[in-house]
A protein has these predicted regions:
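Fungal secretory targeting signals
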Residues: 1-37
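Carbohydrate-active catalytic/glycan-binding domains of CAZyme proteins
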Residues: 27-360
Length: 360
């Protein structure tokens, strides 16, 4: 998702691409409870990865497979053509997020319903954008269901961007979260001026029926977008695009409750991308590498250098420490944008490589 935090700077930011810069870094913040560094637990059954993303080429979903058990080396599949396209809503899909079901028997893809390339402006996309999520499911990552066009936002929400989901063991359901600008339709029926972005969440058991959304993160005037979450040793770690002390970048926070309000999340680090040496970034995506990964078990935080390079990997062996290092020497598809890397079994990896084999 294009970085949009303070709506008053939207037009100037668009005009400045790809020369956008962040304010000075603020560094690591030792706030909140300190969690002891632990050995990284991992699943020895996973022997590769799939990478789902959209591209600077268009607003569709693409797929790459890892070259062996290496989270830093991928080959784009299907002759570089998308594996999923939208036939509903705005006609484009961005920010695809994939998760394995809690039972482990299927996969879900959630994506943003948005097509800037079809003529929608970023301003209109925030004022009267889609209130829907685009959702697919599959048992094998090869054969996908029909597209589900699911309304999750009420009519006073201006957009529904960059959805992700995480299974909450306490609530026994999936928590789905996304960014929206929220308006007072009576006082501001034209949704002008544009509202700042908030992170909201809803719950679902089946990705068909959703609860009414609730506000999760509300931080005016700059707002928050693009949250991604991982759980380790009973603690949730959340990474979000936000402006902290003048630095519009990725912030890391922790909490023992996934749905806790902003005040109950403890800030670990801010300005993560710039501190690591990236260009301006958004669209963070966090995952844990496999036990047998050629570079060992660790955490990788993907960050989207949306000015042109796409995803770059940052690494850490300690989520609680808040120190992230920009990795070099990786091999990703050309300019992959906001998406997800998911661990696979060898059978799953070989399955997608065969089904979407490159023939050109």
């Amino acid at each position: 998702m294009l970085s949009i935090l303070n709506p008053t700077t939207l037009l100037s930011a668009l005009a400045a691409l790809p020369m956008l810069t962040s304010a000075s870094p603020t560094g690591t913040i030792p706030a909140g409870p300190q969690f002891a560094k632990r050995e990284i637990s991992c699943n020895s059954n996973y022997e590769g990865y799939a990478f789902f993303y959209f591209s600077n080429r268009d607003e569709n979903i693409y797929l790459a497979a890892s070259n062996g058990n290496d989270a830093l080396s991928f080959t784009e599949l299907n002759n570089g053509k998308p594996i999923l396209t939208s036939t509903k809503g705005d006609g484009g899909v961005r920010d695809p997020f994939i998760l394995r079901s809690h039972e482990g028997d299927k996969f879900y893809i959630l994506a943003t319903d948005l097509c800037i390339g079809c003529g929608t402006s970023w301003g209109d996309a925030q004022r009267f954008g889609s209130r829907y999520l685009e959702i697919w499911e599959s048992k094998d990552l090869i054969n996908w269901s029909a597209q589900h066009h699911v309304e999750v936002s009420p009519d006073n929400y201006g957009n529904t961007w960059a959805p992700e989901a995480y299974y909450d063991d306490d609530l026994k359901t999936y928590v789905v979260y996304w960014a929206s600008g929220i308006y007072d339709n009576e006082a501001n029926p034209n949704h002008d001026p544009i509202e700042y972005q908030r992170m909201v969440y809803a719950t679902t058991d089946d990705f068909i029926t959703f609860s009414e959304p609730k506000i999760w993160q509300d931080e005016p005037p700059n707002g928050r977008i693009d949250s991604t979450v991982i759980k380790a040793d009973g603690v949730y770690y959340r990474f979000t695009k936000a402006t902290i002390n003048g630095c519009a970048d990725i912030v890391e926070e922790s909490s023992t409750s996934l749905t806790a309000g902003l005040e109950d999340w403890h800030q670990i680090a801010s300005c993560i991308g710039k501190n690591a040496g990236t260009q301006e970034v958004e669209g963070p995506s966090i995952f844990k590498t496999n036990c047998k990964d050629v570079n060992g078990a660790r955490y990788i935080l993907l960050a989207d250098e949306f000015g042109g390079n796409g995803y770059v990997p940052l690494e850490s062996s300690d989520l609680a420490g808040g120190k992230w290092t920009l990795r070099t020497g990786y091999k990703y598809p050309e300019s992959p944008r906001h998406g997800t890397i998911i661990p696979l079994t060898l059978e799953e990896l070989e399955g997608i490589q065969k089904a979407f084999v490159n023939t050109d």
